[in-house]
């Protein structure tokens, strides 16, 4: 079985070190070359290279029951094998279900089963994300796993303090744009069965009486059908209640590549969505329906400081609000338009401010920020703006599309890596030396950031995740 490693060429930041920016190219790495890869990464360790990654793992872990289901579908094994294949020193996993507790340790045990002699996995599980404006379905955790043989976590992890801010500056002035509405499960509508009347004398009556009987029959059948729908929904809700409370607010993916890159949100298997689908009466969460004037981050970034062979570095991992404006939650269209909602636009616009706070908290300028931003293809510059203090190590181009589409291939470059300018040169330092060990297999060198091509995985990619992992070397 072949795996594909998708890499981005060249240094990031034109003129920073006198090199240009290249584009992604696919390279194939067979399992037979694994021993050669192990040698290469052992050499990397000796040369003090550090490999940091991020991955939206798609509603991962959760309760013991949820973990068992994922394990039976090779999800946990696939994620564990890929993480070990990529030889991360540190990797942050997003969309970790809120009920995750003991299953985090079980997953790390599985990671260690696949580990080489130079790797011993440890982990830090964040608390559940907190927000004054996000829905219950958006809550999740971040799981940071790291190789304790190569790095050491210093102190405790930290959530960005997440202040509420006025959203009016980020909202559209009313110009037309597409909104995002949760997709509802199709319910088959059976035509009412008309009751046949007998031809006996006693059954003969006026046309009015016949019409009344048919009307009553239709009404009865409709009530029965409604009851069947409600019963099925309640059964589904009861059966999946454990999973329902686990799952987070999954963002949508482009349904037609090359169209307008407009995403439709995937159905959330939460109690709230189930009730909507069943059209039953429920008390709606005020956070979902209120007309928002202030917002905070739906899922504030979680960060931690590590001692490495290259010095101390702060890594921060995040997951922005779902793409588009969800009218069910009172969300607004972003001022920038282009299919973005005001909430994720607000998060993009305040990312550099959040990074400032994280640096200040740890008193460390060396920061790597990695997140599933839900900022669509072509929108990076308008969404984030420019900064004199920070640089993107990922680019807004075809090569960096990391979110899998529903039909084929990748749809959007949602997953971003940002670093402080003071740390940028350290990221680029010796990156070429590291990649020299792959010349025989990848036929190129000089890479410092990369994207793993999950679409080439041997099983259905979305069985594992709807995102590919990204990473950077320093």
UniProtKB/Swiss-Prot annotation:
Region of interest (Disordered), residue spans: 171-296
Annotated keywords: Membrane, Transmembrane, Transmembrane helix
Biased composition (Basic and acidic residues): 282-296
Biased composition range(s): Acidic residues: 257-266
Transmembrane segments: 3-23
InterPro entries from the UniProt entry: Endo/exonu/phosph_ase_sf
UniProt topology in membrane: Single-pass membrane protein
Low complexity: compositionally biased ranges: 267-281
Location(s), subcellular: Membrane
Cytoplasm listed as a keyword: no
Composition-biased stretches (Polar residues): 231-253
Keyword ATP-binding belongs to the record: no
Compositional bias annotation for Basic residues: 180-210
Signal peptide feature range: none
Full protein name: Uncharacterized protein MPN_491
Source species of the chain: Mycoplasma pneumoniae (strain ATCC 29342 / M129 / Subtype 1) (Mycoplasmoides pneumoniae)
Taxonomic lineage of the native organism: Bacteria, Bacillati, Mycoplasmatota, Mycoplasmoidales, Mycoplasmoidaceae
